[in-house]
Swiss-Prot record:
Protein name: Large ribosomal subunit protein bL34
Pfam family name, one: Ribosomal_L34
A GO CC term assigned to this protein in UniProt: ribosome
Protein family membership: Belongs to the bacterial ribosomal protein bL34 family.
Cited InterPro entries: Ribosomal_bL34 (IPR000271), Ribosomal_bL34_CS (IPR020939)
Keywords attached to this entry: Ribonucleoprotein, Ribosomal protein
UniProt GO MF annotations: structural constituent of ribosome
Compositional bias segments (type: Basic residues): 1-22, 29-42
Chain segments carrying region Disordered: 1-48
Native organism taxonomy: Bacteria, Thermotogati, Deinococcota, Deinococci, Thermales
Length: 48
């Protein structure tokens, strides 16, 4: 069986990136919560 984690930087950015979060109301809520919590990173690091 194929493993679930098949690294792909583009997919990671498109799914979890900052611009992807900003696109939807829910994504903006995620960023708001993470800012409130004081997270260093709002979105996963993507070195493309």
């Amino acid at each position: 069986m194929k493993r679930t984690w098949q690294p792909n930087r583009r997919k990671r950015a498109k799914t979890h990136g900052f611009r992807a979060r900003m696109k939807t109301p829910g994504g903006r809520k995620v960023l708001k919560r993470r800012r409130q919590k004081g997270r260093w990173r709002l979105t996963p690091k993507v070195n493309a």
